């Protein structure tokens, strides 16, 4: 069974990596799918995010990394994936993700959404929080994979 783990991953966090690693034990293949959203101004280009995620997941033989435009369910059909993998941190995540899961099923009844509860040490963590801390010169080394720390630091010069 193939699962898609979609997101912006701008940047990938240890919370994302935790979901990828745990998901890799549940599914034959996981495709980490970076959404190209032209309406957002990302910190890192799609190409850079793909490179970062590939580096962070190179130890997982059943994980591939790709990018896509458009609807997630259309991408899932194209890749013959029947599962969308999502991480849940807090109750508000569940409400939003459940609504999206129902929407996706109205678009394609061949897809299921599987939710994994985020490990408690990452329950507060998001890419937005990482960027906010880094912007003001705070340490993010306990929030992101070590291999992307230099990328983040170079994006936010010291104040």
Curated annotation (Swiss-Prot):
The record marks 16 as: Transition state stabilizer. SUPFAM superfamilies: Nucleotidylyl transferase. InterPro entries: Cyt_trans-like, PPAT, Rossmann-like_a/b/a_fold. One of its GO terms (molecular function) is ATP binding. It holds the Pfam family CTP_transf_like. Keywords: ATP-binding, Coenzyme A biosynthesis, Cytoplasm, Magnesium, Nucleotide-binding, Nucleotidyltransferase, Transferase. Substrate binds at residues 8, 40, 72, 86. One of its GO terms (cellular component) is cytoplasm. It catalyses: (R)-4'-phosphopantetheine + ATP + H(+) = 3'-dephospho-CoA + diphosphate. CDD domains: PPAT. It is an enzyme of class 2 (transferase). It comes from the Bacteria. Pathway: Cofactor biosynthesis; coenzyme A biosynthesis; CoA from (R)-pantothenate: step 4/5. GO terms for biological process: coenzyme A biosynthetic process. ATP binds at residues 8-9, 16, 87-89, 97, 122-128. It is found in: Cytoplasm. Its EC number is 2.7.7.3. Its cofactor is Mg(2+). The keyword Nucleotide-binding applies. Reversibly transfers an adenylyl group from ATP to 4'-phosphopantetheine, yielding dephospho-CoA (dPCoA) and pyrophosphate. Belongs to the bacterial CoaD family. Homohexamer. This is Phosphopantetheine adenylyltransferase.
